[in-house]
Structures are given as C-alpha cells and as structure tokens.
C-alpha cells in the first residue's frame, strides 16, 4: 500500500473537512454542508466517507482528501501529503519519498542545481555578483540563509549539464524543472544565464523553483522558473522559511519581490513576497499562517500603489477577526530598500506605525469622491463607504465597521461640515498617495 492510500484509510474525509465547516449527516457515511469554496444559502456541498470524495453541486469543486487540503490551505500536493501523514501518525522520509520516484528525482535535481549555483557564486566567475550583493548591504550570512547563487555563463551551464548527465539526470528531467527549455526545432537552451539565482522553497524548506535577477543591462530583469508539478506561483510565497526564522515578535513585511525580501531581512525585518504575480487570496491566507498581523509595503511608484489597492480589494471581503493586513504607501516613488537607505530604520518604523487598517483604507478611498461645495459628492462618499463595508463577509466585523462609519458620518453632519474643513476637531493625516488629507473624526473607537 502506498502512502496516499494509507492516509486515506487512516483519516476520514469528514474528519478533515469537519474542522473547517459544520457538516450535517445524511446517512452513515454521507454529509452535506454549505460550501466552503463559494457563498451559498442552501447546502450543496456533499461529502462521502465511503468514496473518500467531496463534490459541490453549486460551484463544481470536487476532489479527495488531498485536493481539499491543497485548496483550503493553499499548499502543494507534497505539503498536503506531509500534513495529513503527520495527522495520521504515519512516518515516512520526506527526503527520499520513495512512494513517488519522479518527485524524489525532481527534488534531488533542484537541490543539485541550487548547490551548483552557490558554488558558482563563491568561485571567480561569481565575483561581479558577490560585489553587487555586498554593495546592497547583503552580507555573507544573509547570502547563505537565502542560498543565493549565480547561474554562470554558457560555458559553465554546459559543464553543469554534462555533470548532471554523468550523475544520471536526463535532458527531460532538466526541462521538467525549468533548467533547460526546448524550442520547436528540438534545440535546447538554458533558461537562466548570467543571473543572480535565488532558490524558491516550499514550506518544508525544499527547493522547488528559482528566481533569477539579471546583473547588468537586458530584459527581462527578473525571471522565475516556469510552473511545474512542484511550483505554482499563485500559491507560493517567497521567503517563508526565513520569515519564520526571523519573526521573533517583529513585524512581518509583505513586499513586491525577492530582492526586497532579502534587503529587508538584512535590515532585521522578516519579509515575504509574491512571485511576479499580483498578491492572490491564496497568498494572503499563507501570510496569515506566518503571522496574525502583516504590513503590505509595495513600491511607492504608481504601479506599486495600484497593486496595493488591488490587494486591498481582494482582502476586504475576507476580513477575519485577529487577522490584520495593514497598508503602507511609501513616498517619492521609493521602494522599501531605497526608503531605508535614504531615511533610516527609525523613519521606516514610523511609516509602519502609520499603516492603515481596512476601515481607514475604505475611508481614504471614499475621500477621493468628495468635492468642496458639492453636496452630491458627499452623498457619493457616504454610499461608497457603505457599499464597501457591505462586501465584508464576516457578520461581526461588518457590523463593527458599519457602527464606526455611521459615527463618523454623524459627526460630519452634526457639525454641518465637509471632511476638508480643518477647523472641526479632526485628526489630519497626510498621505502622499493621492495628495489628499485623510481626516478621521475622534469617535473614541479604534478599529484597525
């Protein structure tokens, strides 16, 4: 019996699903519930212990126990298997993983390539990249912790492929992990050349892909491995292992790219980043698996600011009690590293201190709709606030936000003022993002 079947025989599907949602028994081995994957009022989510299968007749989601854990916890198959094996008390060697020789081979090959890149960085051919890292304030300890390497030139890549073949790996193996790509004429070229190489790890610390930064001129500046059985960009966060290592009650920073993560870590901040994609709902959930509070600090340029707003739109409906994502807008089009280098760590701390919670983000966005001496724009302001609050799925949070919004609105109406009037005992916060002032009435209630 392989490990997958052993797990299925050890844990009932309803036992796993019942930890997340309330199941209603239909008969001895079948259950029905409200679907955890979409909003519905009438239960259409069916669970069968006999078949080891779930199916929602509303949204079409279906699968087995591994599919469910992968979808609900935003993890890869390997991580789902490890979690369920631990839950079932089944011992197995993750490093050898003999039940799946192909997977074992891919993990071994990825580690082998990563080790080779590290050797390149420490060799004479890596001097330029080493100097680049040192100039950015990234020391040897950080380089080692992130396993940073160098892919080398065509000659060194040819030599790497030759050695890998001698060790029993095939070109097909190398194509599957994204080291080599094949064109229409069946010719093979190297995916990463003359790039600073950063291994992307899964939650168990295994290399599953790479990110490469070009040193010097050329495009694309950043390049990720193609998606594989092991690597899914929309579900993976970069830096999770080191973020957990450096957390120690410090603030977790969410930034745009892996160089931001490495730089922030070198300054003492645990950090994670998405991998060339807009931050997804899956990745937001993964962030909260690291810390109950995180600070989104994207670049201060227009692209970074717009990306921040898109993340907020995804985050707002999914607000949870005791899970907070706060938003920071850096001034002067700076990225986090540039801001720290220019202003120092104390100023960066102040920026984090002034981070906005969800309610204040709604408020700030609403203020953009107000025009002085235009009552209709005030009505648009109120409607905007209420419509955004109505998107929140958690009933308790929604009601708390409604109460706070109503108190702020009543203060405005009572004083017969508009939010731009500085004489009405309002706290004024200056944000560079929209060149507007965010005015928060003093209600005595704080909702972050």
Language-model segments: which ranges?
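Structured, non-catalytic alpha/beta "coupling" segments that mediate domain-domain communication
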Residues: 73-80, 84-85, 194-212, 337-342, ...
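Terminal peptide-recognition signature
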Residues: 35, 56, 69, 133, ...
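Conserved active-site segments centered on acidic
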Residues: 79-131
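N-terminal structured subdomain of primase-like DNA metabolism proteins
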Residues: 1-97, 155
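Phosphate-handling DNA/RNA-contact segment within nucleic-acid enzymes
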Residues: 11-13, 17, 103, 111, ...
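Conserved phosphate/pyrophosphate-binding and hydrolysis machinery centered on Walker-type P-loop NTPases
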Residues: 7-10, 28, 99-107, 123-126, ...
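Short beta->alpha connector loops at strand-helix junctions that form conserved
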Residues: 69, 274-277, 298-300
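A charged alpha-helical hairpin associated with nucleic-acid processing machineries
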Residues: 202-203, 244-251, 281-294, 300-448
């Amino acid at each position: 019996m392989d490990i997958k079947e052993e797990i299925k025989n050890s844990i009932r599907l309803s036992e796993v699903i019942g930890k997340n949602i309330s199941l209603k028994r239909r008969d001895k081995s079948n259950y029905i519930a409200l679907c955890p994957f979409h909003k519905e009022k009438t239960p259409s989510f069916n669970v069968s212990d006999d078949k080891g299968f779930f199916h929602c007749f509303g949204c079409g989601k279906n699968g087995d126990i591994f599919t469910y854990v992968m979808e609900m916890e935003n993890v890869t198959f390997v991580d789902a298997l490890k979690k369920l094996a631990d839950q079932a008390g089944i011992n197995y060697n993750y490093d050898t993983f003999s039940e799946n020789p192909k997977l074992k081979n891919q993990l071994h090959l990825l580690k082998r390539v990563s080790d080779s890149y590290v050797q390149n960085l420490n060799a004479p051919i890596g001097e330029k990249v080493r100097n680049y890292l040192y100039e950015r304030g990234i020391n040897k300890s950080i380089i080692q912790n992130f396993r940073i390497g160098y892919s080398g030139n065509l000659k060194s890549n040819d030599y790497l492929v030759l050695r890998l073949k001698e060790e029993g790996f095939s070109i097909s193996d190398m194509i599957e992990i994204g080291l080599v790509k094949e064109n229409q004429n069946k010719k093979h070229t190297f995916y990463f050349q003359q790039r600073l190489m950063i291994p992307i790890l899964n939650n168990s610390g295994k290399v599953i892909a790479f990110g490469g930064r070009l040193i010097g001129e050329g495009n694309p500046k950043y390049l990720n491995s193609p998606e594989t059985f092991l690597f899914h960009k929309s579900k993976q966060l970069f830096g999770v292992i080191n973020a957990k290592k450096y957390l120690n009650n410090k603030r977790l920073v969410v930034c745009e790219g892996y160089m931001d993560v490495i730089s922030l870590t070198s300054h003492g901040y645990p950090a994670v980043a998405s991998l060339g994609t807009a931050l997804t709902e899956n990745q937001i959930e993964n962030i909260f698996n690291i810390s109950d509070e995180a600070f989104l600090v994207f670049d201060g340029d227009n692209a970074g600011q717009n990306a921040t707003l898109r993340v907020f739109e995804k985050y707002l409906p999914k607000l949870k009690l005791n899970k907070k994502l706060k938003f920071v807008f850096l001034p002067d089009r700076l990225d986090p590293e540039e801001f720290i280098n220019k202003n120092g760590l104390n100023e960066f701390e102040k920026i984090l201190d002034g981070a906005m919670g969800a309610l204040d983000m709604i408020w700030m966005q609403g203020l953009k709709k107000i025009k002085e001496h235009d009552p209709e724009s005030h009505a648009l302001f109120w409607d905007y606030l209420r419509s955004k609050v109505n998107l929140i799925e958690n009933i308790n949070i929604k009601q708390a936000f409604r109460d706070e919004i109503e108190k702020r609105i009543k203060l405005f109406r009572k004083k017969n003022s508009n939010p731009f009037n500085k004489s009405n005992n309002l706290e004024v916060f200056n944000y560079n993002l929209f060149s507007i002032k965010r005015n928060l009435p003093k209600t005595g209630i704080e909702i972050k």
